[in-house]
């Protein structure tokens, strides 16, 4: 299923999320079960359409799942469970980040953990720019590789924020 077509939106990485939301609500008005007084009229077909709209909306409103969907539409599957081998430079960065995080977690050093979080957030922003650029250029193989790096960074940021929260509390 092409969610861009479902919402009558251009098939590209950059998306007007307000327009997506507007399209979503307009379509949901037509297909949502609460719109039908007589539940006998509401069919399985409408329920499936409503669920499809929900799934499409959730996919397109998040830039990473939107990129994943774009890649899928261009024959690049993203398997989040698959272990990916990155280039040596990115692998070294991963190891260094985990080591630093572990050291400062054990020391309850919230200042250094904040520094790590800011640093990784900046790296993430740079990769988002790259992803946007390569999607716009339709360089799907490179975009695919960048998306995997972004998935790692997103997970690392989430883990770091959790540790940060634990230290504060």
Swiss-Prot record:
Gene3D superfamilies named among the record's database cross-references: DnaJ domain, HscB, C-terminal domain
Ranges where the J domain occurs: 2-73
Pfam families linked to this entry: HSCB_C
Keyword Chaperone on entry: yes
One GO BP annotation of this record: protein complex oligomerization
PROSITE patterns assigned to the protein according to its UniProt record, in alphabetical order: DNAJ_2 (PS50076)
GO molecular function ontology, one term from the record: protein-folding chaperone binding
Ranges that cross the membrane: none
InterPro entries linked: DnaJ_domain, HscB, HscB_C_sf, HscB_oligo_C, J_dom_sf
Annotated keywords: Chaperone
SMART domains, per the entry: DnaJ
HAMAP family: HscB
Protein function: Co-chaperone involved in the maturation of iron-sulfur cluster-containing proteins. Seems to help targeting proteins to be folded toward HscA.
Family named by the database record: Belongs to the HscB family.
Oligomeric and partner information: Interacts with HscA and stimulates its ATPase activity. Interacts with IscU.
Protein name, per record: Co-chaperone protein HscB
Lineage: Bacteria, Pseudomonadati, Pseudomonadota, Gammaproteobacteria, Enterobacterales
Underlying gene: hscB
């Amino acid at each position: 299923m092409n969610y861009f077509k479902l919402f009558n939106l251009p098939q590209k990485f950059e998306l007007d999320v307000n327009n997506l939301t507007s399209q979503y609500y307009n379509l949901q008005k037509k297909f949502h079960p609460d719109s039908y007084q007589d539940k006998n009229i509401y069919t399985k077909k409408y329920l499936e359409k409503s669920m499809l709209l929900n799934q499409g909306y959730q996919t397109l409103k998040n830039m990473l799942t939107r990129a994943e969907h774009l890649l899928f539409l261009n024959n690049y599957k993203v398997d989040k469970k698959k272990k990916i081998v990155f280039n040596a430079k990115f692998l070294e960065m991963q190891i260094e980040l985990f080591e630093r995080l572990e050291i400062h977690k054990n020391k309850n050093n919230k200042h250094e953990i904040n520094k790590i979080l800011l640093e990784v957030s900046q790296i993430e922003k740079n990769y988002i720019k790259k992803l946007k650029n390569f999607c716009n250029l339709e360089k799907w193989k490179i975009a695919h590789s960048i998306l995997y790096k972004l998935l790692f960074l997103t997970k690392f940021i989430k883990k770091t924020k959790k540790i940060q929260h634990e230290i504060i509390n």
